[in-house]
């Protein structure tokens, strides 16, 4: 049983993802993020945690879309778009990179092997794209 709050947005994303059950992965990632970065709760409160949960389901929606399309670029464009949105709201690119790294760590053995390998590749690409963005834009 999960402790995650399933907002209507999360319920819709889960329906869009389909048969792929990523809830246990999202739960581990969100718990780890809030443990490693306690300031998130202080700065963004319960609404911020809801958004973090939603964002992590969105990450999987775009990973799954890229997988179905066999198109890495789909996830790379999502990662860069997400970065522009979250940075404008006070987040740091490093936290998005960290989030993607935690997804990689926590999905090990949780998905079909072919899907997991594809998702790992897309996440690696997203992490690299964000690091290059940071370097090219001179962000610390």
Predicted features, each with a name:
Residues 1-81, 87-91, 96-101, 108-140:
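Core of compact, soluble alpha-helical bundle domains
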């Amino acid at each position: 049983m999960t402790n995650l709050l399933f907002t209507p947005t999360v319920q819709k994303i889960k329906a869009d993802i389909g048969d792929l059950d990523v809830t246990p992965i999202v739960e581990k990632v969100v718990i780890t993020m809030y443990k490693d970065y306690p300031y998130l709760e202080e700065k963004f409160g319960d609404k911020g945690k809801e958004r973090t949960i939603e964002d992590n389901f969105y990450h999987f929606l775009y990973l799954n879309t890229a997988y179905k399309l066999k198109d890495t670029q789909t996830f790379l464009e999502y990662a860069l778009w997400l970065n522009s949105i979250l940075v404008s709201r006070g987040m740091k690119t490093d936290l998005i990179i960290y989030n993607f790294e935690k997804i990689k760590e926590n999905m090990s053995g949780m998905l079909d092997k072919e899907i997991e390998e594809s998702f790992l590749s897309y996440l690696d690409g997203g992490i690299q794209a964000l690091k290059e963005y940071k370097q090219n834009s001179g962000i610390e």
